[in-house]
Regions:
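Amphipathic alpha-helical segments within well-ordered protein domains
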Residues: 23, 44, 48, 98-103, ...
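Generic structural signal for well-ordered, non-transmembrane alpha-helical segments
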Residues: 41, 108, 192-195
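Alpha-helical scaffold segments in carbohydrate-active enzymes
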Residues: 46-49, 154, 193
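Divalent metal-dependent catalytic cores for phosphoryl transfer on phosphate-bearing substrates
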Residues: 56-169
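Charged phosphate-binding loop/patch that engages nucleotide di/tri-phosphates or the phosphate backbone
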Residues: 175-202
Length: 202
């Protein structure tokens, strides 16, 4: 199988089959299985739309589609009954848990997307300051693909009542603002860079 390189030239293993991986950890036909596939497809579609607008980067579209489908793979390990998940970890932990899963599966670059998509990414300083129940290390999106998927994810609410809806950029800004000023400023920079600028002051 072909090895993967992202925009920075990092090597990252072989190409995954996202549905096969999801089926390994989620019971087909369960609400959690349905949710993670629907949400992943919507984030992937939005991320690919963004990628087409930023051809100068240039992001890898196949990698974006795969990683977007798998970015929430760790939610089954969290206590999120509204998503059909009855694990022991708090929901915020699903990012680094997803990284562990995909690293074990042999997909380290896709694994980074899992860990780095919470909010606009978490810094070690804010993890320590806020006492967040995740490892104390920087979990920030670095590559264009990681940033695009993280940004695209912010347009889709978490939960059964509105999982098929897409937020406006104003609604996404209001949601991300709850994480703090740094997150909102980063989101706004991405909105400009990715040409999604309605409602954002340049």
């Amino acid at each position: 199988m072909n090895s993967i390189k992202d925009c920075t030239g990092r090597e990252g293993g072989t190409r995954p089959d996202p549905i096969a991986i999801i089926n390994k950890y989620y019971e087909p036909g369960s609400f959690a299985h349905d949710y993670i596939i629907r949400h992943g497809k919507m984030v992937a579609e939005k991320a690919l739309e963004i990628a087409e607008r930023v051809f100068w980067l240039p992001p890898g579209s196949m990698f974006i589609e795969e990683a977007a489908m798998l970015h929430d793979i760790g939610i089954f390990m969290t206590n999120a009954p509204h998503l059909g998940c009855t694990g022991d970890y708090p929901y915020i932990a699903h990012g680094y848990l997803g990284r562990q899963i995909l690293e074990d599966e042999g997909y380290p670059l896709h694994a980074y997307v899992c860990e780095r998509h919470v909010g606009v990414g978490l810094t070690a300083a804010e993890i320590k300051e806020k006492g967040l129940p995740v490892p104390c290390r920087d979990m920030l999106p670095i590559t264009p693909e990681e940033e695009i998927i993280c940004f695209a994810d912010k347009f889709f609410p978490v939960g059964p009542d509105n999982m098929l809806t897409m937020r406006s950029i104003e609604e996404a800004r209001a949601e991300i603002g709850g994480y703090g000023v740094r997150h909102l400023r980063k989101f706004d920079r991405w909105a400009i860079m990715f040409r999604e600028v309605s409602g954002v002051k340049e």
